[in-house]
């Protein structure tokens, strides 16, 4: 069964100007939030990087062996970031306004990033605490 990595292999060479953003792109961007970006984007209002730039910085700090030892969700997200960085479709998307807020006192967490596509479209990816357990 195909997954999002297969989709990137299949459609990663097609720009957003040729095929507009779709539901699978949304799924891919939603997964990207699980990459820890704070060391590379410390100021939410001023920091921004392309996916390709973030991948280069992230991979300089995390060896393949280290990535392989990460929990499944984070390992998959790191591998996704690497694949996106090598695709025409995603490499130049700009990541902005990254927030990573954890409160042990309130037992909450929230992270979000705005992804700017080359055509000026914005996508907001976020994750947070679910108190409905």
Question: What residue spans do the PLM features occupy?
Answer:
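Non-catalytic, mobile gating and regulatory segments of ester bond hydrolases
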Residues: 1-133
